[in-house]
Amino acid sequence: MGLNDSSGTLVAPKPKGIIDPNTGRPVGEDDPFFLEINNELADKGFLVTSTEALITWARSGSLMFMTFGLACCAVEMIHTSMPRYDSERFGVAPRASPRQSDIMIVAGTLTNKMAPALRKVYDQMPEPRYVISMGSCANGGGYYHYSYSVVRGCDRIVPVDIYVPGCPPSAEALLYGILLLQKKIRRTGTIER
C-alpha cells in the first residue's frame, strides 16, 4: 500500500517492537524479558515505568569507581580497566576524584595511619555511594591481621557493600564483584538507600 494507492484509508503498520537489522526478527524474541518489552512496544508504542526503576537502571549502568589502591591488589584492580577485561563495557569507568565517584574500591592493607584518609575520601563521595572491599587484607587484615598497625578489615572504617576474596583476587573476581554490585543496586534501588 503506497501513498498513491486509492483503495482506502492509510493505516500505519502495527509496530513489531525492536527489530534486529541483521535477522529482521524482534530482538530477544526467546528471552522473556525482551519479549515483554517488545509486546509493550507493539501494543502502546512506548514504555511505561516508574521513576525509581528508571533511575535505578540508569545508575546501575553508569557507575564510576575511584581506586583506593593500598598494596598488591591494586595491580589486579587496574587489570579490570585494561583491554582484556574492559570494565567500561559493563558501564563502569574509573574516576580520579571522589566527588565524581559512585564506588570506592579498597584494595590492599589498610593501616591505622591510612584509615582517617579512607574515611575522609569516603565522606567526599556523593550519595548513594558504594564500597567494594578487594582482597584478604582489605576484608579482614589478611596476612598482616595480627600486626599492631593494621586495621582488621576496612568495614570497621566504612560500610562495605561487596567483599571480593583472594590474595590477590583475580581481575575476573573483581569484575564479578562489580556485576554483583550492579545487581544489588537494581534489586534494592537507590532512593531508599
UniProtKB/Swiss-Prot annotation:
Cell compartment(s), UniProt: Cell inner membrane
- Originating gene: nuoB
Primary location class: membrane
Outline the segment boundaries, as ranges, of region: Disordered: 1-25
State what protein this is by name.
NADH-quinone oxidoreductase subunit B
Q: Which InterPro entries match?
A: NADH_UbQ_OxRdtase-like_20kDa, NADH_UQ_OxRdtase_20Kd_su
Output the Gene Ontology terms for molecular function: 4 iron, 4 sulfur cluster binding; iron ion binding; NADH dehydrogenase (ubiquinone) activity; NADH:ubiquinone reductase (non-electrogenic) activity; quinone binding
Q: Which GO terms describe its biological process?
A: aerobic respiration; electron transport coupled proton transport
A single GO cellular-component term from the record reads: respiratory chain complex I
Query: Its biological function?
Result: NDH-1 shuttles electrons from NADH, via FMN and iron-sulfur (Fe-S) centers, to quinones in the respiratory chain. Couples the redox reaction to proton translocation (for every two electrons transferred, four hydrogen ions are translocated across the cytoplasmic membrane), and thus conserves the redox energy in a proton gradient.
Q: What EC number(s) does the entry state?
A: 7.1.1.-
Q: Which Gene3D superfamilies match?
A: 3.40.50.12280
Task: Write down the chemical reaction(s) this protein catalyses.
Answer: a quinone + NADH + 5 H(+)(in) = a quinol + NAD(+) + 4 H(+)(out)
